[in-house]
């Protein structure tokens, strides 16, 4: 606070957002370059639209709306859904991580903890939602890589997988 006002600011933090552009120009009804949200929701779902808006660029910068970017977010959400749905027999809410772990399991647990730390920092301190989503994509890739090396699941594997997926 610079002390220029005789009263307290009405908020502690302010996040100003950039403009959404279409083909390099500000979206505008008069220009006819808007995106119909109903069409996006119908074709891809509201979660896809939200993910794309948050993932495309830092919130303070302008970003160019891209149908390819929307499709990429849709594919990513489906990839996460498949990871969970195809492996639901290995997921339990009552998981318990007991150390020491096998090396590959220890690596995944470490990766999850690093993602938690980075995501928490990016949300709490920097409002960098695009990097949060990037870290979540990296974590999803790490879980897929770990899962691809497993033919059978031990109890330890189930607990580690549950921890990674439910986190």
Annotate each language-model stretch with its function.
Residues 165-167:
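Amphipathic alpha-helical
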Residues 6-159:
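Long, charged, mostly alpha-helical binding arms that flank functional sites
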Residues 1-5:
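Metal-dependent nuclease catalytic cores in nucleic-acid-processing enzymes
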């Amino acid at each position: 606070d610079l002390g220029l006002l005789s009263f307290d600011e009405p908020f502690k933090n302010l996040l100003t957002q950039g403009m959404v552009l279409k083909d390099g120009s500000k979206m505008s009804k008069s220009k006819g370059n808007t995106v119909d949200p109903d069409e996006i929701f119908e074709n891809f779902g509201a979660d896809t639209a939200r993910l794309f808006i948050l993932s495309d660029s830092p919130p303070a910068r302008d970003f160019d709306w891209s149908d390819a970017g929307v499709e990429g977010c849709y594919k990513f959400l489906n990839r996460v859904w498949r990871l969970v749905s195809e492996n639901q027999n290995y997921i339990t809410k009552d998981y318990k991580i007991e150390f020491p772990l096998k090396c590959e399991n220890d690596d995944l647990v470490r990766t999850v903890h690093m993602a938690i730390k980075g995501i928490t920092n990016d949300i709490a301190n920097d409002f960098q939602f695009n990097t949060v989503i990037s870290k979540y994509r990296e974590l999803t890739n790490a879980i897929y890589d770990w899962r691809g090396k497993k033919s059978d699941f031990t109890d330890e594997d189930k607990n580690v997988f549950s921890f990674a997926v439910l986190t």
